[in-house]
UniProtKB/Swiss-Prot annotation:
Family label: Belongs to the UPF0312 family.
Additional detail: On the 2D-gel the determined pI of this protein is: 6.99, its MW is: 20.9 kDa.
Protein species of origin: Delftia acidovorans
Induction comment: By the herbicide dichlorprop [(R)-2-(2,4-dichlorophenoxy)propionate].
Protein name: UPF0312 protein
Coiled-coil boundaries: none
Amino acid sequence: APATYAIDPTHTFATFEIDHNGASTNRVRFKSGTVEFDRXAKAETNGGDFEARIDRNAFGV
């Protein structure tokens, strides 16, 4: 069965970057959210499932 983990804002965070035609890079850091990981599916499908849910209002630039 999948396990759900919370993003711990004091130890971890999720980020992404947007490149603007090489002129600048915007970086976004999400401060909260959850991650769901199914270890059994990883073993069965040689990759598994990974899902992240992040509140779009919970980010800092």
